[in-house]
Amino acid sequence: MTEIRYVRLLTLVLASSVLLAGCSSAVPTTPVRSATPSAAATPTATPVVPPTVNPAATASLHAAARSGDAEAVRSALAAGAAIEDRGEGGRTPLVEAAKGNHVEAARALIEAGADVNAKDDIQDSAYLYAGAEGYLEILRMTLTTGADVNAKNRFNGTALIPASEHAHTEVVRMLIAAGVDLDHVNTPGWTAMQEAIVLGNGGAGAQDVVRQLLAAGANPDIRDSRGRTSLCNATRLGFGAIASQLRAAGATGC
């Protein structure tokens, strides 16, 4: 009886050992990764595809701008021309159109978003060309679409200075209304008033320019690079009518 109990007990012990060995030899599991990406993951950037530019259409755009063909300008733009492409002399199509006073071609370019402040190799923009040459309609378009009214040309002068020199009276009126700096001094040492006198002819146009500038508050007593005031120069050059205007405004002589 004792022997039988011993055999049963031994059998139970062996069975328990087998079970414990099976538990301890379980295959380790691989950690399961979350299906949700971590917050630090960087999304893949979508490549930026540049817009297609048509070189032939761009060449046609320059030609159309130079000749003033507004319809050809629109066709070239629709065909993929680069509106800010630089051609001869660093001129954009808009600068080319403005330089030739091609109003409708310039309008088509401006309506398409051309930069009215883009300058060519000699530092002239569509706005500056229009002011210097007296192209009133192009000047108006550039002013109403963001032209920098105090942009400077290669002589460090505003559009008002050459406009005054050439007695473009309506341009002068428009620039004054736009808020241009009346007393800016360019590299040669002249304000708009000085240039109207020194490089003008003293005629009716120059007189009107001086009158407008005085009425707008321009300072007639600023001296040029030789130390001469506007009245001094008007007197020296024999422009009696302008000298009288300046005296009436209380200007200082030499």
Curated annotation (Swiss-Prot):
Under PROSITE patterns, the record lists: ANK_REP_REGION (PS50297), ANK_REPEAT (PS50088), PROKAR_LIPOPROTEIN (PS51257)
In this chain the ANK repeats are located at 56-85, 89-118, 122-151, 155-184, 188-222
Q: Where is the lipid attached (N-palmitoyl cysteine)?
A: C23
Instruction: Give the UniProt subcellular location, in the record's own words.
Output: Cell membrane
Q: Which GO terms describe its cellular component?
A: plasma membrane
Lipid anchor positions (S-diacylglycerol cysteine):
C23
What is the recorded membrane topology of this protein? Lipid-anchor
Matching entries from Pfam families are given as:
Ank_2 (PF12796)
Q: Does the keyword Signal apply?
A: yes
Query: What UniProt keywords are attached to this protein's entry?
Result: ANK repeat, Cell membrane, Lipoprotein, Membrane, Palmitate, Repeat, Signal
Say yes or no: keyword Membrane present.
yes
**InterPro entries recorded:** Ankyrin_rpt, Ankyrin_rpt-contain_sf
Signal peptide location: 1-22
User: PANTHER family under this entry?
Assistant: ANKYRIN REPEAT PROTEIN, GH09064P
Q: What is this protein called?
A: Putative ankyrin-containing lipoprotein Lxx09580
Organism, scientific name: Leifsonia xyli subsp. xyli (strain CTCB07)
